[in-house]
């Protein structure tokens, strides 16, 4: 499952490796790009939905790269639960979470959730093994070219 798939770059890679891919994004532009890009690939299914509305089917891999932090905070924990329930034992979850020092978290704390190491442990380590964690705290451009102060936790987890 490619969550918040955008232009479908992760989906394209997974398809090239033989995966069946369910991808969703709330953006009309993403829908247009992906339905055109993968129109001839029967292993690709696109859903024009948000994290809040998506019904996660059973999956061996769920990727939410640079997308999960756009989930409405009031639905965030239920979305994590639905993701967890969709994965079998040994399934992989790849997520990026904002840290507490991220510019968006500081400016709009009701819209974005910032996570500490303890928050991440509390959220995931009961049901997952942590395979990879990289913390990034640097100024990088957004797609529009504006510089943003990013504080990210990039995680790869395997379900127990």
Describe the residue ranges of each PLM region.
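Intrinsic-disorder/low-complexity coil detector
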Residues: 56-57, 87
């Amino acid at each position: 499952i490619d969550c918040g798939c955008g232009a479908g770059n992760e989906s394209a890679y997974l398809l090239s490796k033989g995966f069946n891919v369910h991808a969703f994004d709330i953006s009309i532009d993403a829908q247009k790009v992906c339905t055109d890009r993968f129109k001839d690939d029967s292993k690709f299914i696109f859903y024009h939905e948000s994290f809040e509305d998506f019904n996660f089917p059973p999956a061996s891999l769920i990727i939410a790269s640079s997308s999960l932090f756009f989930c409405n905070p009031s639905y965030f924990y239920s979305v994590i639960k639905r993701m967890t329930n969709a994965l079998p034992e040994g399934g992989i979850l790849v997520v990026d979470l904002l840290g507490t020092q991220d510019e968006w978290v500081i400016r709009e704390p009701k819209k974005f959730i910032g996570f500490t190491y303890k928050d991440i442990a509390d959220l995931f380590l009961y049901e997952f093994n942590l395979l990879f964690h990289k913390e990034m705290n640097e100024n990088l451009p957004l797609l529009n070219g504006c510089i943003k102060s990013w504080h990210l936790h990039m995680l790869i987890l395997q379900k127990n």
